[in-house]
Swiss-Prot record:
SUPFAM superfamilies the record matches: UROD/MetE-like (SSF51726)
Active-site positions on this chain: 698 (proton donor)
Transmembrane regions: none
GO MF annotation terms: 5-methyltetrahydropteroyltriglutamate-homocysteine S-methyltransferase activity; zinc ion binding
Taxonomic lineage: Bacteria, Bacillati, Bacillota, Bacilli, Bacillales
One Pfam family it belongs to: Meth_synt_2
Binding residues for Zn(2+): 645, 647, 669, 730
GO biological process: methionine biosynthetic process; methylation
Chain sites annotated for binding L-methionine: 435-437, 488, 603
The protein's Enzyme Commission number: 2.1.1.14
Residues annotated for L-homocysteine binding in this entry: 435-437, 488, 603
Cofactor note: Binds 1 zinc ion per subunit.
The protein's name: 5-methyltetrahydropteroyltriglutamate--homocysteine methyltransferase
Role played: Catalyzes the transfer of a methyl group from 5-methyltetrahydrofolate to homocysteine resulting in methionine formation.
Length: 762
């Protein structure tokens, strides 16, 4: 039996975030196009070289991107919206689609399945000419071959997943458009095969959640492609879950290899193989190392998996690989020497995961005795972290055991609470607010860096934060906002900030992963039991409230978002970790309330993204996710108004869950998705406070008052004005002051115009 090592994708951002810095330098005209392309090529080839040096045999080519791999595919296939037709150069068109411009609205951005990565949503328009506009995978394949002598494995997004992720067509049009994709995919694969590509990875993550009819439709497309490209060696790659429900049909697809996730879809995929076997004429690519988390693998467990598979699989070949692209993990743990030994030893970032693949390959080809020392080391590491005091806190266990049913609900129903809140808060019809953060200017970031490096004192840093807070309180008053925020100038990241102040968390120095475009985040590490230590937001929020007669919102990140945006310990269920976080936040919320804060926002932008891919698994997740939010927020008085915020979600799937959160007000991203949630509300009712975002904060353009008024007008057709709020899509941290102030002025004016119209029509 031939066994090879393979990788599905490598992190793009560079060990020191060189990729991010190059992008932003190009966008700000600090480097020209030639310099940009040269530097990007250097980064791209360096990533290939690292994988080569680590001993990976099938190295992914084409996973590298200037922004997003789905956007790459859209451009490659000619899915370019007509509003960008005035742009002529590749990069101008590409980045206009991704980011928008002064006069052009960007394409929508949303979450990549149930991860924290965002992709640009492809747009289909009537009359679109679908063709292979640019064979980028071929260029990159030839580049790696010529520059490094690497005969790589081209990676492309499959036609079915691509079109399922796209928007702009009716369901009736889907089959027709899908057939139109056959020709460009045939050309793409033919040219790669002709250039010498030995194996081509075709990613179809959507296959984990298809109906029987969709599977048959997908199979017909692959049969049409295979008919035209009979000799290309295709690896049909699935990930993020099992394909158990349709496995029997999948293994008959006309491809040479099938990649399955044996981490996040282990039970389902093993059940399917046990029941139906695996074709002897196909290669099984075994996703055995977790590509979405940062913990060392349990090598004994992985080797047991292969023992099981080798008994049930008749194929002559196997591929050892991660469960998915390593895009979702930091690059290398070697710089994290500040961590405790027990935690550092338990980690495995992308480069360490590549080393684990090679270890497994050695054990499978040379016997386990060839890695006996490494196996012993791994066993000791796992024993140490499992028995750690941080993972066995008696106070946390006692608090969990003591929970009662009444801890998960507010005393009064929403309608009665809202009446009391209106009396207490005295807000106008259609109140205006922002989502929480204001621009983190160069000065803010530089001052924080100086403080962290000990260049300025705690007192100097606190004075600076107070100065920024007061400045933006005054801005908000002048603009005319109704509910203000303190601006979050003390926070780098909405999750990292809390991780640094709760027991059970740790944080890395260089554990960056890509979120969207050049935006990178450094997820905290939940390694132990989570517990409250001291107040986390009290000082800044109370100070902001002391500066104004207007209401100031307390700002917290919710338990499910903290969970979903962290690297989470894998020794207990995620539900239990979420409840631990909720109990800690409950304490903080009670402190805010007792300090005089009457509106408290608990953001849950990641609630939807944590949902399992399969609908049959949704209810269990939604139940504990909602319970976590209720546990955090239900101990406040009826007069205290609880807000929450969500973004980047397919909300139609979770309207009932949103309702069950029982938040007094929810703000939701609306403008970037071109009013999608407004359409959802046409078919259901939402009888609580709601704010539908009136402008896209991810684009530098300042929308006009009329644009925002139009969204307000559309929203009021499906929302009760009595409960309607007006706000941006998301926080304003990444925008510049000169963009934020006029945009908020336009928003407030749109609100005033809407109020006037409502009064006139009353």
């Amino acid at each position: 039996m031939a066994i090879q090592t393979s990788n599905l994708g490598y992190p793009r951002i560079g060990l020191q975030r060189e990729w991010k810095k190059t992008l932003e330098a190009f966008w700000s005209n600090k480097i020209n196009e030639e310099q940009f392309l040269t530097t990007m090529k250097e980064i791209r080839l360096q990533h290939v070289k690292v994988q080569q040096e680590k001993g990976i045999e099938l190295i992914p080519i084409g996973d590298f991107t200037y922004y997003d791999h789905v956007l790459d595919t859209a451009y490659m296939l000619g899915f370019i919206p007509s509003r960008f037709s005035e742009f002529t150069s590749y990069l101008d068109v590409y980045f206009a689609m991704a980011r928008g411009s002064k006069d052009h609205v960007a394409s929508e951005m949303t979450k990549w399945f149930n991860t924290n990565y965002h992709y640009i949503v492809p747009e289909y328009e009537e009359g679109l000419q679908i063709s292979l506009k640019d064979n980028r995978p071929l260029r990159l394949y030839e580049e790696a071959k010529q520059e490094l002598g690497v005969d790589g494995k081209p990676v492309i997004l499959g036609p079915y997943t691509f079109l399922k992720l796209a928007k702009g067509y009716t369901q009736e049009q889907f089959a027709t458009i899908l057939k139109q994709l056959v020709a460009p995919y045939v050309q793409l694969l033919s040219e790669l095969h002709a250039a010498g590509a030995q194996i081509i990875q075709v990613d179809e993550p959507i296959f984990a959640s298809l109906t029987k009819e969709e599977v048959q439709q997908a199979k017909e497309i692959y049969e049409a492609i295979r008919k035209e490209v009979p000799n290309a060696t295709l690896l049909l790659q699935t990930y993020f879950d099992s394909v158990e429900e349709n496995y029997e049909e999948f293994i008959t697809f006309p491809v040479s290899s099938i990649g399955l996730d044996f981490v996040h879809g282990k039970e389902g995929n093993l059940n399917a193989i046990s029941k139906y076997g695996f074709p002897a004429d196909k290669t099984l690519a075994v996703g055995c190392i977790d590509g979405r988390n940062i913990w060392r693998a349990d090598l004994d467990e992985v080797l047991t998996l292969f023992t099981t598979l080798q008994k049930q699989v008749q194929t002559k070949d196997l591929i050892v690989q991660p469960s998915c692209s390593l895009l979702h993990t930091p690059i290398d743990k070697t710089e994290e020497t500040h961590l405790s030994t027990e935690l550092f030893d338990a980690l495995a970032f992308a480069n360490q995961k590549l080393e684990e693949l090679v270890l497994i390959h050695s054990a499978l080809t040379q016997g386990t005795e060839s890695i006996s020392n490494e196996l012993e080391t791994y066993r000791n590491v796992h024993h140490t972290i499992r028995s750690s005091a941080a993972r066995n806190r008696e106070d946390v266990k006692a608090a969990r055991t003591a929970l009662k049913e009444e801890d998960f609900s507010r005393p009064l129903p929403f309608e009665k609470r809202y009446e009391l809140q209106q009396v207490a808060l005295k807000l106008p019809l259609l109140p205006t607010t922002t989502i929480g953060s204001f621009p983190q200017t160069t000065e803010v970031r530089q001052t924080r860096k100086e403080w962290r490096n000990g260049i300025i004192s705690n007192e100097q840093y606190e004075q600076f934060i107070e100065k920024e807070t007061e400045k933006w309180i005054r801005y908000q008053e002048e603009i005319g906002l109704d509910v203000l925020v303190h601006g979050e100038f003390e926070r780098t990241d909405m999750v990292e900030y809390f991780s640094e102040r709760l027991a059970g968390f740790s944080f890395t120095k260089n554990g960056w992963v890509q979120s969207y475009g050049s935006r990178c985040v450094k997820p905290p590490v939940i390694y132990g039991d989570v517990a409250f230590i001291n107040g986390m937001t009290i000082k800044e929020t109370v100070y902001a409230q002391s500066l104004t007669e207007k209401v100031v919102k307390g700002m917290l990140t919710g338990p499910v978002t903290i969970l979903n945006w962290s690297f989470v310990r894998n020794d207990i269920p995620r539900k239990e970790v979420s409840y631990q976080i909720a109990l800690a936040l409950r304490h903080e919320i009670e402190l805010l309330e007792s300090s005089g804060i009457r509106v408290i926002q608990v953001d849950e932008p990641a609630l939807r993204e944590g949902m399992p891919l399969k609908e049959k698994d949704w209810d269990a997740y939604i139940t504990w996710a909602v319970q976590s939010f209720l546990l955090a927020t239900s101990s406040v008085a009826n007069e205290t108004q609880i807000h929450t915020h969500m973004c980047y979600s397919n909300f139609e799937d979770i309207v009932d869950a949103i309702r069950a959160l029982d938040a007094d007000v929810i703000s939701i991203e609306t403008s970037r998705s071109h009013g999608e949630f407004i359409d959802t509300l046409k078919h259901t009712t939402y009888e609580k406070g709601i704010g539908l975002g009136v402008y896209d904060i991810h684009s530098p353009r300042v929308p006009s008052k009329d644009e925002m008024y139009k969204i307000v007008e559309q929203s009021l057709q499906v929302c009760d004005p009595k409960y309607f709020w007006i706000n941006p899509d998301c926080g304003l941290k990444t925008r510049r002051t000169e963009e934020v102030i006029p945009a908020l002025e336009h928003m407030v004016q749109a609100a005033k115009d809407a109020r006037s119209l409502l009064k006139t029509n009353a």
